[in-house]
């Protein structure tokens, strides 16, 4: 790869009794390796996306895998020319991906992992119910052909959607997917708890599918939303054509950028009529700072913070 920056999405469900104590040394390991991005720590494990040079990512992964609990931490890689994150952060959370249902624990029960090479055959089975576990704005960018869109705004809405629409006695085979594998893994644990028997999820998520399945064999339609400044990636993991509205976080395409309601860093057609005046003024000020820093060839104005956050 010619690109200078490696982007690594990583996670693992594993009991971390000392996750609070891990926060500071993990942050220091990121700083020592010049890694940017955000990692989440919780009792149930670790999750996040980070970026650095090849050497920096390898250094952080080596540090993580020095802990026997994280020796097999799952990670997917893609590449870009510029640093896609501004900050280096470690946050403490109740959940590394928030479902909001007590007792759901992938460390205790989880669905059947499906390797990317076997995914096409599974979802081509007419008896399989294929569910996209991501949020509505992510699904709008791209999804697998034939997948059901729950139209959820957050993952917290997923349990109610399942209860309202599906029955374990009628839906015998369920396959789920998400960006990097973590959300659908937790969703599979929830589904098993609700009585669904045959529950499958894409190992490594969409990003691993892009890595391993040739584009000519792909059943994916569109781009994949990613949680960094690239906004989306194509099947070949190159950066897509979408931008992101900094006010509402919604992805926006070229047509939406041409709208009279689009103002870079301030508003877009999805949010222009819902923003409060206070939010709009704050966004305008923020954008001015960004443009001024860029014109003076200075670091991004929100890029100075190194944080270990509770």
UniProtKB/Swiss-Prot annotation:
One of its GO terms (biological process) is tRNA modification. It is an enzyme of class 1 (oxidoreductase). It comes from the Bacteria. SUPFAM superfamilies: Rhodanese/Cell cycle control phosphatase. The keyword Oxidoreductase applies. Gene3D superfamilies: 3.30.70.100, Rhodanese-like domain. Residues 124-218 form the Rhodanese domain. The keyword Oxidoreductase applies. The active site is at 178 (cysteine persulfide intermediate). GO terms for molecular function: oxidoreductase activity, acting on paired donors, with incorporation or reduction of molecular oxygen. InterPro entries: Rhodanese-like_dom (IPR001763), Rhodanese-like_dom_sf (IPR036873), TrhO (IPR020936), TRHO_N (IPR040503). It catalyses: uridine(34) in tRNA + AH2 + O2 = 5-hydroxyuridine(34) in tRNA + A + H2O. Its EC number is 1.14.-.-. Keywords: Oxidoreductase, tRNA processing. Catalyzes oxygen-dependent 5-hydroxyuridine (ho5U) modification at position 34 in tRNAs. PANTHER family: RHODANESE-LIKE DOMAIN-CONTAINING PROTEIN 7-RELATED, THIOSULFATE SULFURTRANSFERASE/RHODANESE-LIKE DOMAIN-CONTAINING PROTEIN 2. Belongs to the TrhO family. This is tRNA uridine(34) hydroxylase. It comes from Pseudomonas putida (strain GB-1).
């Amino acid at each position: 790869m010619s690109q200078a920056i490696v982007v690594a999405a990583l996670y693992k469900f594993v009991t971390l009794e000392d996750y609070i104590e891990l926060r500071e040394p993990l942050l220091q390991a990121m700083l020592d390796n010049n890694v940017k991005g955000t990692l989440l720590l919780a009792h149930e494990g670790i999750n996040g996306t980070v970026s650095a040079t090849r050497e920096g990512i390898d250094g952080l992964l080596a540090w993580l895998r020095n802990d026997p609990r994280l020796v097999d931490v799952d990670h997917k890689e893609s590449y870009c020319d510029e640093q896609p994150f501004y900050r280096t952060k470690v946050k403490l959370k109740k959940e590394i991906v928030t479902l909001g249902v007590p007792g759901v624990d992938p460390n205790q029960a989880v669905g059947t992992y499906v390797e990317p090479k076997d995914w096409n055959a599974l979802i081509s089975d007419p008896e399989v119910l294929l569910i996209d576990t991501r949020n509505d704005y992510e699904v709008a960018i791209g999804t697998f052909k034939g997948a059901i869109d729950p139209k959820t705004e957050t993952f917290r809405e997923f349990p109610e959607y399942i209860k309202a629409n599906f029955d374990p006695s009628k839906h015998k085979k369920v396959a789920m997917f998400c960006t990097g594998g973590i959300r659908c893994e937790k969703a599979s644990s929830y589904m098993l708890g609700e009585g669904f028997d045959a529950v499958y999820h894409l190992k490594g998520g969409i990003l691993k599918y892009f890595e391993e399945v040739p584009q000519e064999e792909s059943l994916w339609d569109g781009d994949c939303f990613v949680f960094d400044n690239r906004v989306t990636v194509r099947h070949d993991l190159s950066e897509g054509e979408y931008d992101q509205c900094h006010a509402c976080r919604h992805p926006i395409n070229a047509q939406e950028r041409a709208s009279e309601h689009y103002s870079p860093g301030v508003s877009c057609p999805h949010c222009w009529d819902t923003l409060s005046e206070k939010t709009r003024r704050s966004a305008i000020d923020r954008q001015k700072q960004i443009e001024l820093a860029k014109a003076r060839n200075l670091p991004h104005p929100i890029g100075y913070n190194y944080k270990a956050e509770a």
